[in-house]
Amino acid sequence: LMDNNILASDYGILQIEKIVRLGLKVDFNQALDARLVTDDIAKLLAKVKWIKRIRFGCDTPGQIEECERSISLIDKYGYRGEYFFYCILLDDFKESFNRVNHWKNKGCRFIHYCQPFRDIKNPKQTIPQWQRDLSHWVDRKVYFRSCEFEDFEPRIGFKCKQYFYERQKEIPGM
């Protein structure tokens, strides 16, 4: 289903209850909003027959805590499947990297997809190379599971550890 706000309406909750009652397999491919997961909703989501996994958006550092809270609630009611996180890469390299790495360190049950931020009002926007490289590393699991981002070599002669050195020069005290 393509409704990232399904948890925000009573009608949406009724639809999920119907999905559970009918035993339908479902995928909310636009990601759910973890901030809206209550104990009752977690209990309901744990009963859903997911096609693959539960999807959440995790576009800011504050959403990590909300996703963690939601995961704990849903798991409390017996869900043992995978979780998938959409991570938009914003302007801050360190913040984006730390958010992505948080889920990497949680293990294979937590899968994520990264996408550079695209400004729909600026069709000529230039995507920073670090965003391209970070999303390339994350989204291709053969790289993501076999090396750390610092060691990732997206182009001959360039390792991504360079991004950490560049940021240290830009940010005093880093």
Model-predicted segments: where are they?
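Core AdoMet radical
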Residues: L1-S70, G81-D91, I111-Q115
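Generic secondary-structure transition motif, activating predominantly at the C-termini of alpha-helices
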Residues: V20-G23, K49-W50, D75, V138, ...
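Surface-exposed amphipathic alpha-helices with a cationic face
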Residues: V20, I71-G78, N101-K104
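Generic hydrophobic segment detector
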Residues: I16, C58, G62-Q63, E68-K76, ...
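Auxiliary Fe-S-binding modules of radical SAM enzymes
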Residues: I88-M174
